[in-house]
């Protein structure tokens, strides 16, 4: 049993920080110490921001994004192409695509991927509302931006099957060589996907 090195409030802060993805126990201790040292500049404003987020953040009933409004800012933006929806696994994927700023479209967050071994079927994901959005008639293209994992591919095939009865185009992100990537450092699966996804030059 490890010795306690601080009061219960500090220990609780460290334990909670350690649950944040990317922070292990050591990183959580360092983060907690930094926050405590910068109490006025960081800890107090962070606590206030987290409390406000807990009160005001909602899940968008249209697309599954997180925002302080429902529907979210993306779904209500009239400048976005409502005819194209990019389907992603998680909100973090949506944010990554938004940072790339490649397309001004709408999104749909599934909340994960199909994984029968983990007990995750279609009913556990945000799939029914995607079908309902497509059935509304405004959507012309669905872009499947799921990860290139077994579960991601299973989900993509399932969605393609579910959307086959609609007069829409279903596409998927190309997989392959990253910008600035050297072929010698890529794995065989990535190279094979790049060859299959080749385009005219």
Curated annotation (Swiss-Prot):
Q: Name one GO biological process term.
A: DNA repair
- Kindly list the GO molecular function terms attached to this UniProt entry: DNA binding; zinc ion binding
Any matching Pfam family: RecR_C
InterPro entries in the cross-refs? DNA_Rcmb_RecR, Rcmb_RecR, Rcmb_RecR_Znf, TOPRIM_dom, TOPRIM_RecR
- Zn-finger regions (C4-type) at which positions? 60-75
Q: Which family does it belong to?
A: Belongs to the RecR family.
Q: Which domain of life is it from?
A: Bacteria
Which Gene3D superfamilies does the entry mention?
A: 3.40.1360.10, 6.10.250.240, RecR Domain 1
- What is the recorded function of this protein according to its Swiss-Prot or TrEMBL entry? May play a role in DNA repair. It seems to be involved in an RecBC-independent recombinational process of DNA repair. It may act with RecF and RecO.
Instruction: Please report the organism this UniProt entry assigns to the protein.
Output: Mesorhizobium japonicum (strain LMG 29417 / CECT 9101 / MAFF 303099) (Mesorhizobium loti (strain MAFF 303099))
Report whether Signal shows up as a keyword of the record.
Answer: no
Q: What is this protein called?
A: Recombination protein RecR
Q: Where is the Toprim domain?
A: 83-178
Q: Which UniProt keywords apply?
A: DNA damage, DNA recombination, DNA repair, Metal-binding, Zinc, Zinc-finger
């Amino acid at each position: 049993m490890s010795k306690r090195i601080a009061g219960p409030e500090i220990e609780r802060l460290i334990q909670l920080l350690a649950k944040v993805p990317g922070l292990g126990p050591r990183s959580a201790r360092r983060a907690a110490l930094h926050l405590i040292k910068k109490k006025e500049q960081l800890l107090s404003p962070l606590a206030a921001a987290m409390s406000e987020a807990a009160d005001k953040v909602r899940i968008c009933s249209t697309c599954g994004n997180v925002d302080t409004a429902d529907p979210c800012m993306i779904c209500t933006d009239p400048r976005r192409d409502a005819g194209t929806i990019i389907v992603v696994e998680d909100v973090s994927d949506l944010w990554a695509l938004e940072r790339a700023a490649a397309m001004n479209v709408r999104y749909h967050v599934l909340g994960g991927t199909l994984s029968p071994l983990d007990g995750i079927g279609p009913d556990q994901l945000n799939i029914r509302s995607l079908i309902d959005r497509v059935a509304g008639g405004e959507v012309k293209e669905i872009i499947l931006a799921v990860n290139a994992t077994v579960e991601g591919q299973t989900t993509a095939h399932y969605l393609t099957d579910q959307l086959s009865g609609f007069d829409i185009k279903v596409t998927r992100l190309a997989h392959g060589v990253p910008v600035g990537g050297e072929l010698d450092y890529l794995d065989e699966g990535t190279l094979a996907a790049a060859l299959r996804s080749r385009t005219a030059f």
